[in-house]
Each structure stands twice: as structure tokens, then as C-alpha cells.
Amino acid sequence: MPNDRESGPSGLSPRELERYKRQLILPGWGLAAQARLREAVVFVAGAGGLGSPVTQYLAAAGVGTLRVCDSGVVELSNLNRQLLHADRDVSHPKVRSANRTLRRVNPHVRIVPLEAVIDDHSVEALVGDAGLIVDCLDNFPTRLVLNAFAVRRSLPMIHAGVTGYCGQITFLHPPATACLACIVPEAPPPEVFPILGATAGLLGCLEALEALKFLAGGGTLLTGRLLFCDGSTMQFQEVAIEKDPRCPVCGRR
């Protein structure tokens, strides 16, 4: 991080104030909201098609610490949608190129690259002191592990998923809302699915927007609502989702 901390009461340096000035004039934003972003710690699960736009926009907006977790290596077939990575990164860990790219996006942000598998044993240490989880994963078994941890710790989690031209997104914060297991009780069988880079970009940007609204304290979140996006027809549909009292993960909370 650059050492230019001649800051005012907000804790933001002159360079940071200049960097963020266009969002600082948003109605209801201001220095207080920007300072909240600067103090925030966000856990981003996945540095791929969704994680690329999520982490870049959170870094650009000035979120203080991003814990970016991915166990995979960059493959050539990733590069149509995973803009954190480039040709030179093929066969190397995704978190390595993610760390390099995000530091270029905003040197004021702390990046914690975590090359690890998320499972029942590792999830607590990986999430660490994050106050928000952003699900940018591409497999449901790991999503459900992350969801169960979020429920136990009462942590908010933003979920999104994409396939082809389509995607979905919601904001989960049990016990006030349903959890992911209320919506998808069991992991569907694994498959290789088609995906267009722009679809992942769209849903990732929506996840970043939800995260920034939550952290800054403005706007209406997608709590209790699942937003479906069909890029092939440009139709957006919202459905209400309710907590399942019989859910084995959150039903008794």
C-alpha cells in the first residue's frame, strides 16, 4: 500500500479523496460511507468469471481488505470471461494473477490471496474477520459449505450463479432471510456448462453493487428476492424467496 496517509477526519488521504470523488458525490454517500468501505473486510470465494468483476469493482471503489480465495490454476479456456488473468498466467494459481491485477487497480486496497480449498475444516480460517461473503463459485457443494458457515456466524452472503446467457443473484442474511439451502437444498450433479463472458460480467457487477450498497449503507438490497437475468432476451424477473422453516441449515435459527 502507498504511504500517503496525510488524512483528514475521514482517514482518507488526499489521493484517495481525489480517486473516489465521483462516488463521494452520490446522494447519501459522502465521506462517512467511503470511510466504512475503507474499514471493510470482504471474503470473495472464487477468482474466476464472477470473481473477476466483483474484486475489480470492490477494489476500485476502495473496499479496504479483500480476502480472495481460489484453489485453481488459470486455464486457457478461462480467458473468455476471467479478466483478472491473461495468457501469461495460464497454469499458474489464479490468486497470484488476481493479486497482481488488483494491486494495479488500486494500490490503497489490501489484497489477501488465499490459495486453498473451501471445506468444513478450512472455511473459518479462510473467511477470517470478513464481515461479508461474496459467492463467486461455480460449484454447489462448496457453495453449501460456505452457506452453512454464513448461517452459523450470521454473516451476510451475496449469491450469484451463471450459465450461458442467464444468471441469478440474491442477498442472503439469515436468520432474517432464507439461506441458500432453502433455495437449493441439494447440490445438483456437476457438469460442464456453457458461459458467455459478458453474462458473468453482468452478474459479477450486480454482486459488486449489492456489496457496495451493503457496506456503504445505502440503497435497497435483494433480501427476500431472487433476480433472474436472461441476457438473450434482456428480460429480468424477480421472484420472492422465503425462509424454509424445515431447512436443516437455518430452519431453527
Which residue ranges define each predicted feature?
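Adenine nucleotide-associated cytosolic modules
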Residues: 1-253
